[in-house]
Amino acid sequence: MLAIFAAASRARAGIEVTAPVALVAGDRQSDGIFPQWSIAQNIGIRSLARLRSGLLISPRREAELAGFWREKIGIRTLDMNNNIFSLSGGNQQKALFARALGSDARIVLMDDPMRGVDIGTKLEVYDLVREEARNGRTFLWYTTETEELDNCDHIHVFKNGRIVANLSRDELTEEKIIQSSFGDAA
């Protein structure tokens, strides 16, 4: 996932990305959050062009964006100016989703984004992802949790860096995933 995300910002043989891209990291501690920043700043960093007033970031615009996503995605905090670490892990992950969904990205890469997140948060985010997909956003979702595949239209099974199976949601079975992953399908 990180290689695809990196390809969006530079020319690379064989990969062409023609739309804005955002990443929702599963390992929020190392790849996702900015630990010294507020919740609002963590959400707004992907939307700087919209938040600027001249050369500076408009605190009002940043607060409006953060407030909108606090309500829409249900980030549980009284003050979006609190440090990101004041949130639970699930709410930190919601802030990362808010960063991606609040941006201009038409493609959202999700790198095992629900790892270690409670079931309530997962269900809320699944609903939001489906809503955004219906509105035209594309999601590329790497997951280690097979139940998350129910949220996908197409499933690609990878083995040794290559696609070994392309399944529609209707074709999806755990048996086909395991067979593709561990069989001689390469």
PLM region descriptions:
Residues 1-186:
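Glycine-rich phosphate-binding loops of nucleotide-dependent enzymes
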